[in-house]
């Protein structure tokens, strides 16, 4: 197979300069056919991109940077491509013999200007890949913005996820065209200079904030609830939430409660801001709340978070997120709660975050936020299945089954209510961890998947502070998390001995 990109030579960018495109682990050759510019770009765009590169990106090259030297190997069109990917807004060549003629569209329009217009209107666009041979929409997705710093960073993010979708289509595997949770947001469109100026101002403000405060600073909320909980009400109403105290220079996130052999513990990510690396810790809960101190239970040389727990064949297992290590590892509890041994590697050679498992119709299904090395971290859902927890695990026929920043990334345990399977998902439409949604799974098999978001949850009077990105329950105990402003001076002051309750276990008010 040969793939041909059609791009405007006057606006050649680094993301276009590639010899291959990775498709299902194979490097498929890419050739580029340069075309004349169909539409002029906003005045001074490349100068603004260069300013962002120097200030926002600290001089690091990015995918939206202009190519200074056009590679000779791409100057001529060989005419042998099997798949054409036309990134311009020019009319399709009616005599093109390629079996697929793919046209990315951004909020319904083609070309880089359409992507820029969406960004300048206040949001990343919905991406659709259209086969111009018959007009069919072959895939649809909405990228997340974790790496979208500035106008150039946003454009790079959009094109990275566009290539993800192109690779999935070119693989020949069936695609699931999702109905996205939300359309792209729009505001009054700013000019590029104003957009960049605002981005630089925001970046400076964030740097000042990070000098004064730990950012982000996550904390855990808990409550005992004898009645209908979040899953039944679709909101955060009910008994008030209490914040699990922390020492200030650590944050706690991703709470997973479990009762094992008569004792209940909440496991969570414990990140020391001074080190910048997470471990897994736990704290016991009694009938009235936390008991004793936080106990470290699992540490590796790499960052750990999201300690998903599952009981299987009489054993307790943990799958902490270890995406920086490039695998999905399974740990066995050999002494509860504080001794765990690595037992197996379920998946290797991939970047998969927040692995979460459910069982359905005799199979195990593992969901995770998948990333192919570029673009956002929270928009792509991959599913794997197996007959046994230890595997072997096989990929879903349509991976990634969904690209949607508002409903892809897992946010806690699956639940079954009245025979229906549900999962909490992160809603990152307004930024990473900004909110939660409750999604009902309508179809799930090795070849099908469909979910519908039924409820959305945001921080507010019932959960003050900022952000909300995990939901779990064990018996009466419900847990969530969020973030707050945490000044570094307060964290320093809290290290001195005092007569008050230990900050690790004392309840406090979310703020």
Residue ranges, per PLM feature:
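Blade-edge beta-strand/turn elements of extracellular beta-propeller
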Residues: 235-245, 289-297, 335-349, 384-406, ...
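Residue-level marker for isolated small/hydroxyl-bearing positions within beta-strands
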Residues: 267-269, 319-321, 367-369, 424-426, ...
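Loop/turn-rich, solvent-exposed surfaces of beta-rich toroidal or solenoidal domains
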Residues: 359-390, 403-440
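One-carbon transfer enzymes
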Residues: 1-265, 269-304, 308-311, 317, ...
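Blade-level signature of beta-propeller repeat domains, shared across WD40, Kelch, NHL, RCC1
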Residues: 430, 434-444, 451-453, 460-503
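Short glycine/acidic-enriched loop and turn motifs that connect beta-strands
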Residues: 271-275, 323-326, 371-375, 428-431, ...
């Amino acid at each position: 197979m040969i793939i041909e990109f059609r791009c405007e030579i006057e606006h050649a960018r680094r993301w276009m300069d590639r010899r291959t495109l990775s498709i299902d682990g194979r490097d498929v050759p890419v050739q580029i056919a340069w075309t004349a510019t169909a539409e002029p770009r906003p005045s001074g765009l490349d100068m603004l991109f260069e300013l962002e590169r120097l200030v926002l990106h600290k001089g690091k090259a990015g995918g939206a940077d202009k190519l200074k030297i056009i590679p000779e190997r791409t100057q001529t069109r060989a005419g042998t491509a099997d798949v054409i990917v036309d990134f311009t807004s020019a009319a399709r060549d009616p005599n093109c013999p390629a079996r697929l003629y793919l046209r990315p569209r951004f909020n319904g329009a083609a070309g880089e200007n359409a992507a820029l217009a969406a960004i300048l209107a206040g949001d990343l666009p919905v991406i659709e890949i259209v086969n111009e041979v018959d007009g069919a929409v072959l895939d649809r997705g909405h990228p997340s913005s974790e790496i979208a710093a500035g106008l150039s960073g946003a454009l790079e993010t959009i094109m990275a996820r566009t290539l993800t979708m192109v690779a999935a289509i070119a693989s020949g595997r069936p695609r699931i065209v999702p109905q996205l949770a939300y359309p792209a947001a729009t505001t009054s469109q700013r000019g590029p200079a104003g957009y960049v100026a605002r981005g630089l101002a925001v970046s400076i403000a964030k740097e000042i904030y990070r000098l004064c405060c730990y950012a982000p600073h996550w904390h855990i909320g808990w409550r005992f609830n004898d009645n209908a909980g979040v899953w039944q009400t679709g909101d955060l109403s009910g008994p008030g939430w209490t914040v699990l105290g922390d020492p200030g220079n650590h944050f706690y996130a991703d709470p997973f409660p479990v009762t094992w052999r008569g004792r209940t513990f909440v496991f969570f990510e414990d990140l020391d801001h001074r080190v910048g690396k997470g471990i897994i810790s736990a704290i016991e809960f009694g009938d009235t709340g936390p008991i004793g101190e936080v106990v470290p239970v699992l540490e590796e040389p790499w960052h750990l978070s999201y300690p998903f727990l599952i009981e299987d064949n009489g054993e307790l297992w943990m799958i902490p997120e270890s995406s920086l290590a490039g695998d999905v590892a399974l740990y066995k509890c050999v002494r509860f709660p504080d001794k765990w041994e690595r037992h197996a590697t379920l998946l290797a050679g991939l970047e998969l975050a927040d692995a979460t498992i459910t069982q359905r119709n005799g199979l195990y299904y593992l969901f995770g936020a998948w990333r192919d090395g570029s673009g956002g971290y929270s928009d792509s859902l991959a599913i794997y299945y197996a007959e046994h927890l230890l595997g072997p695990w096989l990929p879903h026929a349509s991976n990634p089954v969904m690209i949607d920043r508002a409903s892809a990334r897992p946010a806690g345990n699956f639940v079954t209510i009245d025979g229906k399977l549900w999962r909490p998902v992160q809603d990152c439409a307004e930024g990473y961890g900004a909110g939660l949604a409750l999604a009902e799974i309508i179809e799930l098999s090795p070849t099908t998947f469909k979910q519908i978001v039924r409820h959305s949850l945001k921080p507010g009077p019932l959960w003050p502070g900022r952000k909300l990105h995990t939901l779990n329950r064990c018996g009466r105990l419900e847990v969530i998390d969020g973030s707050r402003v945490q000044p570094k001076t307060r964290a320093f002051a809290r290290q001195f001995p005092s007569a008050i309750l230990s900050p690790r276990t004392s309840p406090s008010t979310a703020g």
